[in-house]
Amino acid sequence: MEESHFNSNPYFWPSIPTVSGQIENTMFINKMKDQLLPEKGCGLAPPHYPTLLTVPASVSLSSGISMDTESKSEQLTPHSQASVTQNITVVPVPSTGLMTAGVSCSQRWRREGSQSRGPGLVITSPSGSLVTTASSAQTFPISTPMIVSALPPGSQALQVVPDLSKKVASTLTEEGGGGGGGGGTVAPPKPPRGRKKKRMLESGLPEMNDPYVLAPGDDDDHQKDGKTYRCRMCSLTFYSKSEMQIHSKSHTETKPHKCPHCSKTFANSSYLAQHIRIHSGAKPYSCNFCEKSFRQLSHLQQHTRIHSKMHTETIKPHKCPHCSKTFANTSYLAQHLRIHSGAKPYNCSYCQKAFRQLSHLQQHTRIHTGDRPYKCAHPGCEKAFTQLSNLQSHRRQHNKDKPFKCHNCHRAYTDAASLEAHLSTHTVKHAKVYTCTICSRAYTSETYLMKHMRKHNPPDLQQQVQAAAAAAAVAQAQAQAQAQAQAQAQAQAQAQAQAQAQASQASQQQQQQQPPPPQPPHFQSPGAAPQGGGGGDSNQNPPPQCSFDLTPYKPAEHHKDICLTVTTSTIQVEHLASS
């Protein structure tokens, strides 16, 4: 006897169910296939359900396996019931073929000897033609087609046409009703011509082998961008399948690549290398036009647009509606619009401060966390910084590069902040009025004083700072009081000077108001009336004239006094001479 294509090893065969159970399973499978796979063609292979085999004796060994149903039923059907049997004719077929058999439930009582005959096994060849056997040893009172796989275990799954069982059942019914027996060849329906289209399930998801390819509707949305691969977890789209697979590892796989400088981990070594450039400050991508360098190639490509010969509107097509600035992409425009609107969507979780840019929030968060990702790579230097600009300024100290020079004294500094602090010493406006209470050092601003106080590291810095502020306030109040006292003293001195001036003026006025002294008899001032007698004689004596002409040297009043003195002396001399 030839070996059957079915595996005869009972180890690979599960327990054989009853005929009623097989019929229920078959009806359930056909129902589920009608619901889930409404279209022709399916990418899912049906499961193989072992059946109860009853091989008739009329089939020869060359075309199949012959066995009497009544005599061999006990050998092949140890689990079957005594009153119900299932009859399937098995014919050897190539391993790529498909067998469709009519499964019948024959209510056969042993006391009845008559059986109705029907068509036997139906086989589909690899070319697609249906072959029915003309065996008369089968019993098909009720024709319920069932799919039986003829492949050995481990073979490739077969493509099953869902409606094939119904068509075979109708064919068997017509042939059985027409005369009961003859076999024939039934041609399957021709497949539709043209390119195969993606089959859609009722749930709306496309049925395809590659889970990363976009659906037809999504292809239309991303046709302009050229992104045909989408992540199933976060719906991001990518240009190539490799990029999407690398991205998908962030959702499903672990991140074995850890940064040696911080606690971040990455799923790909390329992402880790790109992240390490942040700590090292390396910028391997340089611009050929302006010699600027960038950490990522995409940043260099975006920067190269500035040097392009295209028009400015083409390079920066996105224009701000509030001002005349233009931008190369929408993200830069959205970031710029926050300046006009005042929106600050990024909030600090520690102090509730808000920022317009995410990078500003990240820099601010490092103040609370103490993270210093920018470390100096100079041998023997272990300094780290929160910002890249601070690291670049620190590197100039190792290189002895001091590009910031003072135009007054020609001193040079490594950064602009140091130069600005130095320039304040050349101006009177920025005087060093903030003095340290511990070492008496003075600074131009309170911020510098606070930084200096941290170096002393006192046990209670805040109290000392408050005491210093109170002492400064007291000193300022005392200075104001002294200034007020000086102002009052000056006012008093001015008042005294004014009083003295007024007194001198009053004394001068009193001296001017006193009457002149009496004159001698023989001296008459010019214009005086003659002495003596009668009223109105025409002979008037001329006034005596002074023999001393002192007019060029003295004014009239002093001249009068001198004349009186000289006259008195003359009278005395004459009196002495006469005596």
Curated annotation (Swiss-Prot):
Which domain of life does this protein belong to?
Answer: Eukaryota
Q: Where in the cell is it found?
A: Nucleus
Instruction: Report whether Metal-binding shows up as a keyword of the record.
Output: yes
Regions of biased composition (Gly residues) lie at 175-185
InterPro entries to which the protein is assigned, alphabetical: Znf_C2H2_sf, Znf_C2H2_type
Is Cell inner membrane given among the entry's keywords?
Answer: no
Which cysteines pair up through disulfides? They are none
Q: What does this protein do?
A: Transcription factor that binds the consensus DNA sequence [GC]AAAAA. Seems to bind and regulate the promoters of MMP1, MMP3, MMP7 and COL1A1.
The family classification in the record reads:
Belongs to the krueppel C2H2-type zinc-finger protein family.
Q: Return the protein name.
A: Zinc finger protein 384
Gene name linked to the record: Znf384
